[in-house]
Amino acid sequence: MSPNSEATGTAWAPPPPRPSRGVIMISSVSTNDVRRFLLCMRVYSTVAVQGTCTFLLCLGLVLAFPHLKGTVFLCCTGFMPPLSLMVPTICLALLHGKRDEGSFTSPPSPGLLTIYSVLTTLSVIVASACSSSTLVTFSGLLACVLFSLCSCVTGLAGHNHRRWQVIVTLFVIGVIAFLIALYLQPVPLGHKLFLGYYAMALSFMLVVTVFDTTRLFEIAWSEADLLTLCLYENLVYLYLLILILFTTEDSLDKLIAWMTWLSSRATGATNAASISGCDLLREVQRNLTRTMA
């Protein structure tokens, strides 16, 4: 019996044991934490399934029809990969337009989200048809790595403003260093401008992906489908930008050949009646290469 318990007449009970360091008490995990974990699992599993199916369809099309990049006219002009960015750009603008003062308005119907997803997937497949299987595979893997890196950065920084400042500073330094290195490369000015433009677009999309990932800590369960589609759009946008970066030089040469072909048709210098569009563009490109050499 404790002296205090004798004075008060109550039975003395030993204090509860303190948990040792490194031991997580089950009671410290709240219902909100469990719900947030399930929400993250739902979002990322859906994005993973969508992204995997899209990349497999792209790779399957390229392997099944490897001649498309040499026979489809838009592929021969170099327009197809940049044109494919229009669909995810419009979809992302519409999806982010659903936000109102920092929170989503009423979530769109599942049918509308499905339409967005199908249109984006088709644009990615069409753009991949103008590339090789090696480029499709490498671009898809690199896009997944960058997307995962954005998720890791978001989880590492959390709500710590100091960490965000360090991450943003390192990111800006990396972008500036890349642009300086690109400027010092012995390549034509047109190639530098195209590469610099798409590199800046890729940097911007990384920022957008990190921003969308931070919303995992804010949204409700009913808004998960909308955020899932946003992250999927970000993933395929990264893939398309990487694909364009690896094919910029070839696309620029094709574009110059196409413009030369148009000018020759306008002046009547070329008889295109007996030659297909792609064959004619390849002939013009070979002539330009010999002239520049």
UniProtKB/Swiss-Prot annotation:
Glycans are attached at residue 287. It comes from the Viruses. Its main location: membrane. The keyword Transmembrane helix applies. The keyword Acetylation does not apply. Keywords: Glycoprotein, Membrane, Transmembrane, Transmembrane helix. The chain crosses the membrane at residues 55-75, 77-97, 110-130, 138-158, 164-184, 193-213, 226-246. It is a multi-pass membrane protein. It is found in: Membrane. Pfam families: Bax1-I. Signal peptide: none annotated. GO terms for cellular component: membrane. Belongs to the cytomegalovirus US12 family. This is Uncharacterized protein HVLF1. It comes from Human cytomegalovirus (strain AD169) (HHV-5). The lineage of its organism: Viruses, Duplodnaviria, Heunggongvirae, Peploviricota, Herviviricetes. The gene is US17.
